[in-house]
Amino acid sequence: MKSKRAKGALASGLGLVALTATYLTVPWEGVENKAYWDSLGKVWTVCAGETKGVKKGDYYSDAKCLQMLQTRLENDFHKPLQKCIATFDAAPISIQASMLDLSYNIGTGAACSSSAAKRMREKNWPAACNAMTLFNRAGGRVVEGLKKRREYGDAQRIGELELCLAGLK
């Protein structure tokens, strides 16, 4: 059974980057307007997981955080995914959004060399969705938050697999 909330997200009419930011990246990353030290990643972080050029003491408004995220999603993640996965634009938007969020979280190099990317190149959409769930570990251990993000989410947030599968016929 397809998720009603994921179908609702897909029916919102948002473009790829806005859909990804609104329903996946921001809910899972959260928004911190003031830079903080990410002890796991060992890097200064701000907004919705932004690390590029962030320094201690940086502060951004909510509007600036959203603008920065959408710019990064488009330029640093969407465009590279289009280059490394020739069939990216042929995939349903639900798969594109899930892969874009995965790439933002794990990096384009890992996303482009993943089994999910391989399945997308084969146009095996259901297998691509399921392959994204493999990225649920940090430090060699399954992390409950990553497991939920990759799969069916939680009470407040849509998971990548949940959205991914909702767009398949």
What are these regions (language model features)?
Residues M1-K34, G41, E50, V54, ...:
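Long, amphipathic alpha-helical surface segments
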Residues T45-C47:
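Short hydrophobic-aromatic micro-motifs
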Residues D76-S114:
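Active-site nucleophile-His-acid catalytic modules used for acyl/amide transfer and hydrolysis
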